Amino acid sequence: MIEVGDLKKGMFIIYDGEIYRVLEASKHFMGRGSGLIRTKLKNVKTGFVREVNFPSGEKVQEAELSFRKAQYLYRDGDHYYFMTLDDYEQYALSEEEIGDAKYYLVENMEVDLVFHEGTPIGIELPTTVELTVVETEPSFKGDTVSGGGKPAVLETGLKITVPYFIEVGDKIKVDTRTGEYVGRA
């Protein structure tokens, strides 16, 4: 059992007999009374997102999960295919199970497949990934004076803000937790 005040984005819990991934968790305190933990939970099987408010101090069950190293192979329709590196078994995950991780997946990339009772329910990405810029505005001399950045589209369709010196074709590092530019690859 885990206290709801310790819930963090990305954790898996069992609530109402179903497995949920925590999308958001924030603490709210009201005057004298005890606090409230507001969460946004995504049902792993159905993809349904619900908001649940827990009184602080309440406990929930953390889902028992196992992780296996896998390689992302390809996408076919709305399914993503992975091969485990230990026994070379292939698994397909739906777009709902993958979620926003689809914007960081590049063929042959290594990820951790998340299993619950022998069934894959999601993936864990590395902290940073290298992606290629496919579309951005050209930079001009003196652009760096104003600071900030310019919009760019990456090979996976992810749209982020990059510094002015980044050009089309550049490989950059992106933080998978925040979706922000980290540096050149």
Curated annotation (Swiss-Prot):
<dbReference type="InterPro" id="IPR001059">
    <property type="entry name" value="Transl_elong_P/YeiP_cen"/>
</dbReference>
<protein>
    <recommendedName>
        <fullName>Elongation factor P</fullName>
    </recommendedName>
</protein>
<dbReference type="InterPro" id="IPR011768">
    <property type="entry name" value="Transl_elongation_fac_P"/>
</dbReference>
<dbReference type="Pfam" id="PF08207">
    <property type="entry name" value="EFP_N"/>
</dbReference>
<dbReference type="InterPro" id="IPR014722">
    <property type="entry name" value="Rib_uL2_dom2"/>
</dbReference>
<comment type="similarity">
    <text>Belongs to the elongation factor P family.</text>
</comment>
<keyword id="KW-0251">Elongation factor</keyword>
<dbReference type="InterPro" id="IPR015365">
    <property type="entry name" value="Elong-fact-P_C"/>
</dbReference>
<dbReference type="GO" id="GO:0005737">
    <property type="term" value="C:cytoplasm"/>
</dbReference>
<dbReference type="InterPro" id="IPR013852">
    <property type="entry name" value="Transl_elong_P/YeiP_CS"/>
</dbReference>
<dbReference type="InterPro" id="IPR012340">
    <property type="entry name" value="NA-bd_OB-fold"/>
</dbReference>
<comment type="pathway">
    <text>Protein biosynthesis; polypeptide chain elongation.</text>
</comment>
<dbReference type="Pfam" id="PF01132">
    <property type="entry name" value="EFP"/>
</dbReference>
<dbReference type="Pfam" id="PF09285">
    <property type="entry name" value="Elong-fact-P_C"/>
</dbReference>
<dbReference type="InterPro" id="IPR008991">
    <property type="entry name" value="Translation_prot_SH3-like_sf"/>
</dbReference>
<comment type="function">
    <text>Involved in peptide bond synthesis. Stimulates efficient translation and peptide-bond synthesis on native or reconstituted 70S ribosomes in vitro. Probably functions indirectly by altering the affinity of the ribosome for aminoacyl-tRNA, thus increasing their reactivity as acceptors for peptidyl transferase.</text>
</comment>
<dbReference type="InterPro" id="IPR020599">
    <property type="entry name" value="Transl_elong_fac_P/YeiP"/>
</dbReference>
<dbReference type="GO" id="GO:0003746">
    <property type="term" value="F:translation elongation factor activity"/>
</dbReference>
<dbReference type="GO" id="GO:0043043">
    <property type="term" value="P:peptide biosynthetic process"/>
</dbReference>
<keyword id="KW-0648">Protein biosynthesis</keyword>
<dbReference type="InterPro" id="IPR013185">
    <property type="entry name" value="Transl_elong_KOW-like"/>
</dbReference>
<keyword id="KW-0963">Cytoplasm</keyword>
